[in-house]
């Protein structure tokens, strides 16, 4: 892995303040893991958090792991602006992520069982240049090794991303296959290896939400499906931002 920054993760994220209490209460007979997902989150939708929850429940059921928490790492503006516009600025995307996490907790507060702790990690997106996900994984794992030495970072992604990119990591990956399932890429075709901590999970319950569909819904004036796709507080932020940036839709989507 290349060196991507002269700054450290610690300048953007208080690992010890967060993890010391979690490690103190962890069952030391189990493997300590932290989940990580990366992406544009332009904007964040329900599936971004749901894949973390699916991964969490899958690991929890094995009773072999302490799932300490999960990190969400949004990409820098310099990368996101070259994807489908309009670009939601980094700090606003971070605010949306925080609100999504808060709404996610509210919606699940009455459910029995343990809850996954989810935190925004701003290190990646705070840079003026793009940092690819393998380097994000490497840098965060390096900080965890330096501070603790016994925490494994597990990268959580969709099956599309796993097939295209993350399969090359070779270890420490949880891939979620959503409807419509990838033909020919099930558990029988891609090797699941618990020794190398590669987990392939088929999810047949979640809706196929996406950031692209949210932008398309706005273009069509379909606010009801935007509400279904994301969280209440995020919905209001999305509509306000898109209303203020309709020119981007006119230029790029022939907005009507």
Where are these regions (language model features)?
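Nucleotidyltransferase catalytic core that binds NTPs
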Residues: 1-256
């Amino acid at each position: 892995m290349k060196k991507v920054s002269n700054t450290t993760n610690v300048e953007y994220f208080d690992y010890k303040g967060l993890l010391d209490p979690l490690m103190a209460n962890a069952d030391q007979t189990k493997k300590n893991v932290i989940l990580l997902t990366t992406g544009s989150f332009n904007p964040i939708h329900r599936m971004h958090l749901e894949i973390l929850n699916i991964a969490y429940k899958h690991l929890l059921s094995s009773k072999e792991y302490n799932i300490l928490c999960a990190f969400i790492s949004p990409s820098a503006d310099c990368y996101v602006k070259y994807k489908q516009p309009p670009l939601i600025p980094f700090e606003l995307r971070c605010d949306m992520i925080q609100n999504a996490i808060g709404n996610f907790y509210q919606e699940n507060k009455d459910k029995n069982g343990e809850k996954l702790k989810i935190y925004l990690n701003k290190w990646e997106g705070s840079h003026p240049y793009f940092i690819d996900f393998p380097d994000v994984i490497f840098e965060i794992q390096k900080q965890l090794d330096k501070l603790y030495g016994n925490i494994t970072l597990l990268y959580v992604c969709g099956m599309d991303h796993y097939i295209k990119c993350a399969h090359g990591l070779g270890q420490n990956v949880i891939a979620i296959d959503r409807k419509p399932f990838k033909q020919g890429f099930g558990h029988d075709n891609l090797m699941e290896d618990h020794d190398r901590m590669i987990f392939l999970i088929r999810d047949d319950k979640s809706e196929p939400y996406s950031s692209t569909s949210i932008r398309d819904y706005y273009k069509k004036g379909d606010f009801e499906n935007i509400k279904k796709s994301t969280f209440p507080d995020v919905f209001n932020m999305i509509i306000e931002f898109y209303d203020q940036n309709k020119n981007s839709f006119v230029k790029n989507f022939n907005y009507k």
